[in-house]
Amino acid sequence: MSSTPIKRLTLRIGTRGSRLARWQAEWVANRLRGCHPGLNVVLVEIHTQGDRDRNSLLAAIGGTGLFTKEIQRAVLDGLVDIAVHSLKDLPTQGPDELVLAAVPGREDVADALIAPVHQTLQALPAGSQIGTSSLRRRAQLLHLRPDIQVATIRGNVETRLNQALEGKLDAVILAWAGLHRLSLHRHVTQRLAPPDFLPAVGQGALGIECRVKDTTTRALLLPLDDAPTHRAILAERTTLAELEGGCLIPMAAWARDIDVDSDGDQPGQLALDAAVFDPDGHAHVAATLTGPREDPRELGLRMARALRAGGAEPLLERTRQRTT
Protein backbone atom coordinates (compact mmCIF):
# COMPACT_ATOMS: atom_id res chain seq x y z
CA MET A 1 0.00 0.00 0.00
CA SER A 2 1.42 3.41 -0.93
CA SER A 3 1.89 5.93 1.82
CA THR A 4 -0.31 9.00 2.08
CA PRO A 5 1.25 12.47 2.37
CA ILE A 6 0.45 13.98 5.76
CA LYS A 7 0.05 17.52 6.96
CA ARG A 8 -0.35 16.73 10.66
CA LEU A 9 2.69 15.67 12.67
CA THR A 10 0.88 14.08 15.63
CA LEU A 11 -2.32 12.06 15.98
CA ARG A 12 -3.67 11.30 19.47
CA ILE A 13 -5.54 8.05 20.15
CA GLY A 14 -7.93 7.89 23.10
CA THR A 15 -8.00 4.46 24.76
CA ARG A 16 -9.04 2.73 27.93
CA GLY A 17 -6.25 1.69 30.25
CA SER A 18 -6.72 -2.08 30.26
CA ARG A 19 -4.03 -4.26 28.72
CA LEU A 20 -6.39 -5.36 25.94
CA ALA A 21 -7.53 -1.80 25.16
CA ARG A 22 -3.95 -0.57 24.99
CA TRP A 23 -2.97 -3.52 22.77
CA GLN A 24 -5.80 -2.63 20.38
CA ALA A 25 -4.90 1.06 20.35
CA GLU A 26 -1.22 0.28 19.77
CA TRP A 27 -2.17 -2.06 16.92
CA VAL A 28 -4.09 0.80 15.29
CA ALA A 29 -1.16 3.15 15.95
CA ASN A 30 1.26 0.78 14.23
CA ARG A 31 -1.04 0.43 11.23
CA LEU A 32 -1.24 4.22 10.95
CA ARG A 33 2.54 4.58 11.21
CA GLY A 34 2.95 2.00 8.46
CA CYS A 35 0.46 3.74 6.17
CA HIS A 36 1.74 7.25 6.87
CA PRO A 37 5.52 7.41 7.45
CA GLY A 38 6.41 10.46 9.49
CA LEU A 39 3.14 10.53 11.41
CA ASN A 40 3.68 10.65 15.17
CA VAL A 41 0.97 8.62 16.90
CA VAL A 42 0.55 8.79 20.68
CA LEU A 43 -1.81 7.01 23.07
CA VAL A 44 -3.83 8.96 25.63
CA GLU A 45 -5.29 6.84 28.44
CA ILE A 46 -8.85 7.70 29.50
CA HIS A 47 -10.65 6.14 32.46
CA THR A 48 -14.27 5.16 31.83
CA GLN A 49 -17.15 4.53 34.19
CA GLY A 50 -17.00 0.82 33.45
CA ASP A 51 -13.32 0.76 34.42
CA ARG A 52 -13.80 2.71 37.65
CA ASP A 53 -16.56 0.42 38.96
CA ARG A 54 -15.45 -3.18 38.49
CA ASN A 55 -17.77 -4.76 41.04
CA SER A 56 -21.32 -3.67 40.17
CA LEU A 57 -23.40 -5.39 37.51
CA LEU A 58 -23.06 -3.52 34.21
CA ALA A 59 -26.81 -2.98 33.99
CA ALA A 60 -26.85 -1.51 37.50
CA ILE A 61 -24.39 1.27 36.66
CA GLY A 62 -25.94 2.47 33.44
CA GLY A 63 -25.66 -0.27 30.84
CA THR A 64 -24.74 1.02 27.38
CA GLY A 65 -21.78 3.32 26.85
CA LEU A 66 -19.99 2.45 30.08
CA PHE A 67 -16.71 1.84 28.27
CA THR A 68 -17.05 4.48 25.53
CA LYS A 69 -18.74 7.73 26.63
CA GLU A 70 -15.72 9.35 28.27
CA ILE A 71 -13.51 8.53 25.29
CA GLN A 72 -16.09 9.93 22.88
CA ARG A 73 -16.28 13.09 24.99
CA ALA A 74 -12.50 13.46 24.76
CA VAL A 75 -12.73 13.31 20.96
CA LEU A 76 -15.54 15.86 20.90
CA ASP A 77 -13.60 18.19 23.20
CA GLY A 78 -10.47 17.95 21.05
CA LEU A 79 -8.39 16.27 23.75
CA VAL A 80 -7.72 13.35 21.37
CA ASP A 81 -8.19 12.93 17.64
CA ILE A 82 -9.59 9.40 17.44
CA ALA A 83 -11.10 6.77 19.71
CA VAL A 84 -10.45 3.04 19.36
CA HIS A 85 -13.32 0.88 20.61
CA SER A 86 -14.17 -2.79 20.85
CA LEU A 87 -17.23 -2.55 18.62
CA LYS A 88 -19.29 -4.85 20.80
CA ASP A 89 -19.07 -2.14 23.51
CA LEU A 90 -20.01 0.79 21.25
CA PRO A 91 -23.68 1.88 21.45
CA THR A 92 -25.52 2.05 18.14
CA GLN A 93 -26.68 5.59 18.92
CA GLY A 94 -23.86 8.07 19.46
CA PRO A 95 -23.09 11.78 19.12
CA ASP A 96 -23.96 13.17 15.68
CA GLU A 97 -20.62 14.99 15.63
CA LEU A 98 -18.70 11.68 15.56
CA VAL A 99 -18.35 9.19 12.71
CA LEU A 100 -17.27 5.55 12.64
CA ALA A 101 -14.51 6.33 10.17
CA ALA A 102 -12.82 2.93 9.95
CA VAL A 103 -13.49 -0.69 10.84
CA PRO A 104 -10.33 -2.80 10.39
CA GLY A 105 -10.45 -6.48 9.46
CA ARG A 106 -12.29 -8.63 11.98
CA GLU A 107 -10.78 -11.22 14.31
CA ASP A 108 -12.41 -14.60 14.94
CA VAL A 109 -15.97 -13.92 16.19
CA ALA A 110 -16.15 -17.05 18.38
CA ASP A 111 -16.51 -17.22 22.12
CA ALA A 112 -14.06 -19.32 24.10
CA LEU A 113 -14.64 -21.73 26.98
CA ILE A 114 -11.89 -22.14 29.54
CA ALA A 115 -12.68 -25.27 31.56
CA PRO A 116 -9.35 -26.65 32.84
CA VAL A 117 -10.76 -29.87 34.29
CA HIS A 118 -13.71 -30.88 32.11
CA GLN A 119 -12.57 -29.20 28.86
CA THR A 120 -15.94 -28.85 27.07
CA LEU A 121 -19.40 -27.47 27.76
CA GLN A 122 -20.91 -30.89 27.13
CA ALA A 123 -18.61 -32.60 29.66
CA LEU A 124 -19.26 -30.22 32.56
CA PRO A 125 -21.20 -31.97 35.35
CA ALA A 126 -24.67 -30.77 36.31
CA GLY A 127 -24.45 -27.89 38.76
CA SER A 128 -21.13 -26.62 37.41
CA GLN A 129 -20.53 -22.89 37.74
CA ILE A 130 -19.59 -20.94 34.60
CA GLY A 131 -18.58 -17.29 34.85
CA THR A 132 -19.55 -14.55 32.40
CA SER A 133 -20.58 -10.90 32.46
CA SER A 134 -22.73 -11.23 29.32
CA LEU A 135 -26.50 -11.80 29.28
CA ARG A 136 -26.14 -13.13 25.72
CA ARG A 137 -23.67 -15.80 26.83
CA ARG A 138 -25.73 -16.58 29.91
CA ALA A 139 -28.87 -17.09 27.83
CA GLN A 140 -27.16 -19.35 25.29
CA LEU A 141 -25.43 -21.36 28.02
CA LEU A 142 -28.69 -21.98 29.85
CA HIS A 143 -30.42 -22.79 26.57
CA LEU A 144 -27.81 -25.47 25.84
CA ARG A 145 -27.22 -26.61 29.44
CA PRO A 146 -30.16 -25.70 31.72
CA ASP A 147 -28.59 -27.86 34.46
CA ILE A 148 -25.57 -25.59 35.00
CA GLN A 149 -25.23 -22.39 37.05
CA VAL A 150 -24.05 -19.08 35.62
CA ALA A 151 -22.03 -16.77 37.87
CA THR A 152 -21.70 -13.07 37.04
CA ILE A 153 -18.06 -11.96 36.94
CA ARG A 154 -16.43 -8.58 36.23
CA GLY A 155 -12.90 -7.40 35.62
CA ASN A 156 -10.36 -7.37 32.83
CA VAL A 157 -9.57 -10.39 30.66
CA GLU A 158 -6.83 -11.71 32.95
CA THR A 159 -8.97 -11.34 36.10
CA ARG A 160 -11.85 -13.28 34.58
CA LEU A 161 -9.57 -15.92 33.06
CA ASN A 162 -7.98 -16.56 36.45
CA GLN A 163 -11.37 -17.41 37.95
CA ALA A 164 -11.16 -20.67 35.99
CA LEU A 165 -7.41 -21.22 36.09
CA GLU A 166 -7.36 -20.90 39.89
CA GLY A 167 -10.37 -23.19 40.32
CA LYS A 168 -12.73 -20.56 41.73
CA LEU A 169 -15.18 -21.46 38.98
CA ASP A 170 -15.53 -24.60 36.87
CA ALA A 171 -15.27 -22.54 33.68
CA VAL A 172 -15.46 -19.05 32.23
CA ILE A 173 -16.42 -17.79 28.79
CA LEU A 174 -14.56 -14.96 27.10
CA ALA A 175 -14.26 -13.63 23.56
CA TRP A 176 -11.70 -15.57 21.52
CA ALA A 177 -10.48 -12.34 19.92
CA GLY A 178 -9.40 -10.75 23.20
CA LEU A 179 -7.59 -13.87 24.34
CA HIS A 180 -5.81 -14.18 21.00
CA ARG A 181 -4.74 -10.53 20.97
CA LEU A 182 -3.18 -11.00 24.42
CA SER A 183 -1.60 -14.37 23.48
CA LEU A 184 -3.76 -16.13 26.09
CA HIS A 185 -5.65 -18.39 23.68
CA ARG A 186 -3.53 -21.38 24.78
CA HIS A 187 -5.87 -21.62 27.78
CA VAL A 188 -8.97 -22.14 25.61
CA THR A 189 -10.39 -25.65 25.94
CA GLN A 190 -13.32 -25.24 23.51
CA ARG A 191 -14.28 -22.73 20.82
CA LEU A 192 -17.96 -21.83 20.96
CA ALA A 193 -18.52 -20.71 17.40
CA PRO A 194 -21.45 -19.82 15.12
CA PRO A 195 -23.88 -20.98 14.02
CA ASP A 196 -24.23 -23.09 17.19
CA PHE A 197 -23.15 -20.29 19.56
CA LEU A 198 -23.74 -16.82 18.12
CA PRO A 199 -21.49 -13.85 18.95
CA ALA A 200 -22.37 -10.38 20.15
CA VAL A 201 -23.02 -7.62 17.64
CA GLY A 202 -19.59 -6.39 16.56
CA GLN A 203 -17.66 -9.10 18.40
CA GLY A 204 -14.07 -9.46 17.21
CA ALA A 205 -14.06 -6.08 15.44
CA LEU A 206 -12.55 -2.72 16.30
CA GLY A 207 -14.17 0.62 15.52
CA ILE A 208 -12.29 3.89 15.07
CA GLU A 209 -14.23 7.11 15.64
CA CYS A 210 -13.26 10.68 14.87
CA ARG A 211 -14.99 14.03 14.47
CA VAL A 212 -17.21 14.26 11.38
CA LYS A 213 -15.65 17.56 10.31
CA ASP A 214 -12.05 16.40 10.82
CA THR A 215 -11.38 15.59 7.18
CA THR A 216 -7.63 15.28 7.70
CA THR A 217 -8.04 12.49 10.26
CA ARG A 218 -10.71 10.77 8.19
CA ALA A 219 -8.28 10.63 5.27
CA LEU A 220 -5.58 9.15 7.51
CA LEU A 221 -7.96 6.44 8.72
CA LEU A 222 -9.27 5.44 5.30
CA PRO A 223 -6.53 2.84 4.56
CA LEU A 224 -7.40 0.99 7.80
CA ASP A 225 -11.01 0.34 6.77
CA ASP A 226 -11.91 -3.20 5.67
CA ALA A 227 -15.01 -3.14 3.46
CA PRO A 228 -16.28 -6.71 4.17
CA THR A 229 -15.97 -6.19 7.93
CA HIS A 230 -17.54 -2.72 7.80
CA ARG A 231 -20.63 -3.90 5.92
CA ALA A 232 -21.04 -6.93 8.20
CA ILE A 233 -20.86 -4.66 11.24
CA LEU A 234 -23.36 -2.26 9.68
CA ALA A 235 -25.90 -5.06 9.15
CA GLU A 236 -25.49 -6.32 12.72
CA ARG A 237 -25.64 -2.88 14.33
CA THR A 238 -28.68 -1.86 12.28
CA THR A 239 -30.54 -4.91 13.59
CA LEU A 240 -29.62 -4.04 17.18
CA ALA A 241 -30.57 -0.38 16.74
CA GLU A 242 -33.95 -1.22 15.21
CA LEU A 243 -34.76 -3.51 18.13
CA GLU A 244 -33.88 -0.60 20.44
CA GLY A 245 -31.41 -2.82 22.21
CA GLY A 246 -28.11 -2.02 23.86
CA CYS A 247 -24.97 -4.05 24.27
CA LEU A 248 -26.44 -5.63 27.42
CA ILE A 249 -29.48 -7.34 25.90
CA PRO A 250 -29.31 -11.09 25.14
CA MET A 251 -29.12 -10.63 21.38
CA ALA A 252 -26.59 -12.20 19.03
CA ALA A 253 -25.75 -11.50 15.39
CA TRP A 254 -23.24 -12.70 12.83
CA ALA A 255 -22.93 -11.22 9.33
CA ARG A 256 -20.44 -12.28 6.67
CA ASP A 257 -19.93 -12.31 2.91
CA ILE A 258 -21.00 -15.48 1.10
CA ASP A 259 -20.55 -16.80 -2.43
CA VAL A 260 -22.35 -19.45 -4.45
CA ASP A 261 -22.40 -22.80 -2.63
CA SER A 262 -24.20 -26.12 -2.73
CA ASP A 263 -27.27 -24.56 -1.13
CA GLY A 264 -27.71 -22.22 -4.08
CA ASP A 265 -26.83 -18.90 -2.41
CA GLN A 266 -26.36 -16.08 -4.89
CA PRO A 267 -22.88 -14.60 -5.46
CA GLY A 268 -22.05 -11.28 -3.89
CA GLN A 269 -24.44 -11.76 -0.99
CA LEU A 270 -24.25 -10.80 2.67
CA ALA A 271 -25.62 -13.38 5.12
CA LEU A 272 -26.91 -12.47 8.57
CA ASP A 273 -27.79 -14.82 11.42
CA ALA A 274 -29.38 -13.23 14.48
CA ALA A 275 -31.21 -14.32 17.61
CA VAL A 276 -32.89 -12.81 20.67
CA PHE A 277 -32.98 -14.87 23.86
CA ASP A 278 -34.99 -14.97 27.03
CA PRO A 279 -32.54 -13.95 29.80
CA ASP A 280 -32.74 -17.43 31.34
CA GLY A 281 -32.47 -19.30 28.05
CA HIS A 282 -36.00 -20.70 28.18
CA ALA A 283 -36.97 -19.34 24.75
CA HIS A 284 -35.40 -17.66 21.76
CA VAL A 285 -36.24 -16.29 18.33
CA ALA A 286 -33.74 -16.75 15.50
CA ALA A 287 -33.55 -16.04 11.78
CA THR A 288 -31.12 -16.25 8.87
CA LEU A 289 -31.38 -13.83 5.94
CA THR A 290 -29.30 -12.85 2.93
CA GLY A 291 -29.18 -9.68 0.86
CA PRO A 292 -26.98 -7.70 -1.52
CA ARG A 293 -23.61 -6.71 -0.12
CA GLU A 294 -24.24 -3.17 -1.33
CA ASP A 295 -27.11 -2.62 1.15
CA PRO A 296 -26.21 -3.96 4.61
CA ARG A 297 -28.55 -1.50 6.33
CA GLU A 298 -31.56 -2.91 4.52
CA LEU A 299 -30.53 -6.44 5.53
CA GLY A 300 -30.36 -5.31 9.15
CA LEU A 301 -33.80 -3.69 8.90
CA ARG A 302 -35.27 -6.86 7.41
CA MET A 303 -33.71 -8.92 10.19
CA ALA A 304 -35.20 -6.71 12.89
CA ARG A 305 -38.64 -7.08 11.30
CA ALA A 306 -38.21 -10.86 11.06
CA LEU A 307 -37.20 -11.17 14.72
CA ARG A 308 -40.13 -9.01 15.83
CA ALA A 309 -42.51 -11.07 13.71
CA GLY A 310 -41.14 -14.19 15.39
CA GLY A 311 -41.87 -12.89 18.88
CA ALA A 312 -38.68 -11.10 19.95
CA GLU A 313 -40.37 -8.16 21.66
CA PRO A 314 -41.68 -10.06 24.73
CA LEU A 315 -38.19 -11.53 25.25
CA LEU A 316 -36.60 -8.09 25.05
CA GLU A 317 -39.17 -6.69 27.46
CA ARG A 318 -38.31 -9.36 30.02
CA THR A 319 -34.69 -8.27 29.84
CA ARG A 320 -35.60 -4.59 30.21
CA GLN A 321 -37.67 -5.37 33.30
CA ARG A 322 -34.78 -7.28 34.86
CA THR A 323 -32.22 -4.54 34.24
CA THR A 324 -34.24 -1.52 35.38
Question: Predicted regions: what is each one?
Answer:
Residues 2-53, 60, 68, 143-324:
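Small-molecule-sensing regulatory modules
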Residues 80-84, 170-171:
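Short, Asp-centered acidic motifs that coordinate Mg2+ and/or phosphate
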Residues 73, 121-122, 162:
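Alpha-helical segments flanking ligand/cofactor-binding loops in enzyme cores
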